[in-house]
């Protein structure tokens, strides 16, 4: 395949993409397949000779779309969204064509400088004060890992980088049980050890309070342990919990501890000023992460980390061997020194396209619609016999259940097998619940209202096949 063939096939691919998105409502959201079904359709060995693109394209159409769970489906209410707005898809086509590695300024000046400006545009959009700068990671997992590594080095007086962790004191980090599992992964990868991640008890709203955090830190200091950092939750993955950020930041500052706020999902909603009280006090944090690829339409992967003191993270992660130096350019930013990977994609272009193509007003309206529709869906589900709302909507996320875990699990299975909507599960105080999050970029009100209709039909069908009891 040469570049002239690329011209032809790119047009076909663009047509296919538009048709695919237009057809999503007619497809089941989740692939109705058993494990191994796709692999069995592929030959066991690679071809020795080139195959015509017509054959490759035909195989793609025959195998791939029906083997996918459709994350862009308007009725994808599972997990959190991974939205791809049309403007984002267009930008990614251009990025793929240029195929750059934006590891340092010299390798891609436009990628570096657009990233700097886009991060600042987002800072302004979220209402964060001047003084925060930042970078774009692939995921919140790597952003949190970067923050944890920096906290570790601060606590060790920057000795861990040279001397390793052998003989170093056990460092203690603090978070609530509502924080994402990526926090646990960061703690493990950073060599802190799972048992040194203190899960601070939460209040009735599932929030870590300043008082609870202060008590946990005091207990560790009394035991001769070394507190190193605090990780706060702003919109937990399970049911949308928010820690008392202002109170916890104040405690951390009084204790001399840095703070990192995980707002991977909910951070996007903060472009709407009315939602900002949920993360009040965030301006006092040292590090904040949110994912535009979840709710702003800048497709995966695109995770923005804001930093008050990038120098500390650069000191932790940055290396500048001779072969990566840019002569006479000491004032430039090399973003590979801010992140764990050396190689970097040109992720900022899709932000530039999305923010301009929809504007903050357009993006705000989508988020406000999603929140409003989630509340309406909650009310309709609450009116169904046997359905209990377990957690009330936090932004566009809530949960519900039936009387027993077994009945709830069976209902979830029926809903997802039906295919019109897709939901996933969590546990609240040990109870199995069904999560509902509204956030698809192309979702309409009627898509959300179909949720309660589907649940009602699945409950009614139980008369011919009862849901099991615990």
For each predicted feature, which ranges?
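N-terminal entrance/gating region of PLP-dependent enzymes' catalytic architecture
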Residues: 1-131, 421, 443, 454-455
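Short Gly/Ser/Thr- and Asp/Glu-enriched loop/turn motifs at secondary-structure junctions
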Residues: 130-131, 168, 390-396, 427-433
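PLP-dependent enzyme catalytic core of the Aspartate aminotransferase-like
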Residues: 428-470
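Active-site C-terminal subdomain of aminotransferase-like
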Residues: 236, 255, 280-382
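Short amphipathic alpha-helices in soluble, non-transmembrane regions
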Residues: 408-416, 449-456
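Conserved PLP-binding catalytic core of the aspartate aminotransferase-like
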Residues: 388-415
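A short linear hydrophobic-aromatic micro-motif
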Residues: 132, 385-389, 420-425
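Conserved PLP-enzyme active-site core in the AAT-like
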Residues: 139, 143-314
């Amino acid at each position: 395949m040469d570049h002239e063939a690329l011209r032809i096939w790119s047009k076909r691919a663009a047509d296919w993409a538009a048709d695919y998105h237009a057809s999503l409502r007619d497809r089941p959201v989740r692939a109705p397949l058993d494990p191994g079904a796709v692999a069995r359709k592929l030959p066991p060995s690679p071809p020795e000779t080139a195959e015509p693109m017509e054959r490759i394209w035909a195989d793609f159409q025959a195998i791939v779309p029906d083997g996918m769970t459709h994350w862009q489906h308007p009725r994808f209410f599972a997990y959190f969204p991974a939205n791809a707005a049309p403007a984002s898809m267009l930008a990614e086509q251009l990025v793929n064509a240029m195929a750059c590695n934006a590891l340092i300024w010299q390798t891609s000046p436009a990628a570096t400088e657009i990233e700097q400006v886009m991060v600042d545009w987002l800072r302004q959009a979220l209402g964060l004060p001047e003084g925060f700068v930042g970078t774009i990671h692939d995921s919140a997992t790597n952003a949190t890992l970067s923050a944890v590594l920096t906290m570790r080095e601060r606590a060790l007086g920057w000795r861990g980088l040279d001397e390793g962790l052998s003989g170093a004191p056990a460092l203690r980090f603090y978070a609530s049980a509502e924080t994402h599992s990526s926090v646990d992964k960061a703690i493990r990868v950073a060599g802190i050890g799972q048992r040194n991640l203190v899960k601070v008890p939460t209040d009735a709203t599932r929030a870590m309070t300043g008082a609870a955090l202060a008590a946990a830190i005091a207990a560790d200091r009394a035991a001769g342990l070394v507190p190193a950092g605090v990780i706060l939750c702003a919109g937990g993955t399970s049911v949308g919990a928010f820690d008392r950020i202002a109170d916890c930041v104040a405690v951390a500052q009084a204790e001399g501890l840095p703070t990192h706020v995980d707002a991977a999902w909910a951070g996007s909603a903060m472009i709407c000023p009315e939602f900002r009280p949920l993360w009040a006090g965030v301006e006092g944090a040292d590090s904040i992460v949110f994912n535009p690829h979840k709710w702003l339409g800048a497709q995966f992967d695109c995770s923005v980390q804001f930093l008050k003191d990038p120098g500390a993270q650069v000191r932790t992660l940055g290396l500048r061997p001779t072969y990566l130096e840019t002569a006479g350019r000491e004032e430039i930013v090399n973003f590979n020194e801010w992140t764990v990977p050396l190689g970097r994609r040109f992720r900022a272009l899709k932000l530039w396209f999305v923010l301009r193509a929809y504007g903050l007003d357009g993006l705000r309206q989508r988020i406000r619609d999603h929140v409003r529709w989630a509340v309406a869906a909650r009310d309709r589900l609450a009116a169904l016999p046997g359905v209990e709302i377990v957690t009330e909507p936090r932004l566009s996320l809530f949960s519900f259940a039936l009387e027993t875990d077994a009945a709830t699990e069976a209902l979830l299975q029926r809903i997802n097998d039906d295919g019109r909507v897709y939901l996933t599960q969590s546990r609240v105080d040990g109870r199995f619940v069904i999560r509902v999050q509204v956030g698809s970029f192309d979702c309409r009100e009627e898509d959300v209202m179909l949720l309660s209709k589907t649940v009602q039909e699945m409950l009614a069908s139980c008369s011919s096949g009862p849901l099991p009891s615990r």
